[in-house]
Amino acid sequence: MAKILTVFNQKGGCGKTMTAMQLAGTCAMRGYSTLVVDMDSQGTALVWSTVKPDPQLRLKATGFPAKVESFAPLGRGMVRPVADLAPLYDLIIIDTPPAVASEAPWAALQISDLALIPFVPTAADMWAKEARVLARKAMEQNPDIKGVHHLPSMVRRGNTIAGVLDQFKSDPEVSLLNSTVSLLNAYLDSQMLGLCVGQLSSSSTAAKEMSALSDEVLTLLGLAKSVAVKRKGKR
């Protein structure tokens, strides 16, 4: 039975789809049967998964490693179809549109085991307040959810960003993941090829970030213990 993870935020432009797809691709590469449910009407995740690398590039990877389906037209009605698919996968990641313009995120949270809120760490005071509100509302939608965690996304280097993250870490009402997702060209490059960063290079900074994020998320979901089993089964 799949564990269900919802990636959401009140706004757009914070790396929700990038997070959902890179995380899904990384977990799929580890042997987890993974489905991405694209709830955004723009269909970015679905389009991403249909792109095939140019054969002239001679890449080993020929396509995105996780399954992607769009349930965007269903809106709040996506709950039952997703629940019906749960027995077929190890992990289902729901990529949602901005919550300010859609009820889909709140519907997805009702069947989720865990939620991630990617955010761009710029204005600490503004984000801290919004982070608390989003986390509380998510818990209201599903009191049984294992956790609602914030993921620093599109992170740039610098003392200002470090200061913002330090403020978040000291806030007892905000659950901040240890992992971060930096603003790196590798993420966009892999998207343009219809792949995830781990398929291009397992040693790149981006691939290492996604590996760390996968470790953290799988542990929170209670799936990490099966990593060794999954890998052993693929030998």
PLM feature spans:
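Inter-motif core of Ras-like GTPase G domains
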Residues: 103-123
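Anionic-ligand binding region
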Residues: 115-117, 124-155, 161-168
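Conserved nucleotide-binding/hydrolysis micro-motifs of P-loop NTPases
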Residues: 41-43, 122-123, 155-158, 186
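P-loop/Walker-type NTP enzyme "switch/lid" segment
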Residues: 4-10, 14, 21, 25-102, ...
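Inter-lobe coupling/hinge region of RecA-like P-loop helicase motors
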Residues: 188-214
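Beta-strand-loop-alpha "switch" segments that mediate conformational coupling across diverse proteins
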Residues: 154-157, 166-198
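Short, hydrophobic alpha-helical segments
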Residues: 214-225
